Structures are given as structure tokens and as C-alpha cells.
Amino acid sequence: MDQAPFDQQVTFLYTRDLATTVRFYEQVLGLSLVLDQGTCRIYRVSADGFLGFCQRAEAPERPAGIIVTLVTEDVDGWFARLRERGVAFEKAPALNPDYNIYHCFLRDPNGNLLEIQSFRDAAWPRKR
């Protein structure tokens, strides 16, 4: 491909309760707020990756078919920190040999499925 990759990436999700969402992503996950647009908040997940939440009365209660994957080499550390902060996990850290990943799962207050994962495959591009 002749065209360079995009500069940044933002994934937006809807929420019925922005205040609860803000508390979870700021106080529990510790993400930094980069832009407050009133009914939408955008958080930095990595150097060029962002996660945004917009208040919508019609937001689904438990969205299906979406997994927000947060990639880190320290899955166990994140698991321990979040458990200390009262987070209930759907799946404790484990190796998935089918995809050569190590991961765990939890849900945010909106029912979004979050995966904390590390790639074991040497072909995965590492942090720049």
C-alpha cells in the first residue's frame, strides 16, 4: 500500500450513564481524559489509540459482538490491580493456545466486554 497508515484511532461506544462510565475509566482503569465534549469523553488508551464514550438514552444495555482489547505485556499486573479496585472478572488470566495470546476478560459498567491481552506471537508489532 502506498498510503501511510492513519495517524490515530478512536473507538466510540455509547453509554446511558456517562458519570458512571467516567468514574470507571478514570478512577478504576486510570485512563487520562484527553477531550471533554460535554456528552462525549475521549480517553487515551495508548500513544495513538483512544476510547470515547457518548451519552445516549438509546444505548444498548449489554452490547454484543464487540470486544475492546487493551494490549499490555503485564496482564497479571493489571488483573491484580483491578481486582484490588473491586473489579469482577469474567475470566482470569490464561493462555489461549489457539491464538497464542495470554488474556483475561471483564465488563465495564455499560456491559462492554473488555479484554486485557498480551500477544505471545513474535510477529506482533511491539511498542515503538
Give residue ranges: language-model regions.
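Positions that flank functional sites
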Residues: C40-R41, P97-D98, R126
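Conserved short beta-strand elements that form part of the metal-binding/catalytic scaffold
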Residues: S32-G65, L113-S118
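A generic hydrophobic-segment detector
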Residues: F105-R128
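N-terminal beta-strand motif that seeds the catalytic metal site of vicinal oxygen chelate
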Residues: M1-A19, I66-V68, R120-R128
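Short secondary-structure junctions
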Residues: G30-D36, F89-P93
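Vicinal oxygen chelate
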Residues: D17-L18, V68-L113
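Amphipathic alpha-helical segments
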Residues: D17-S32
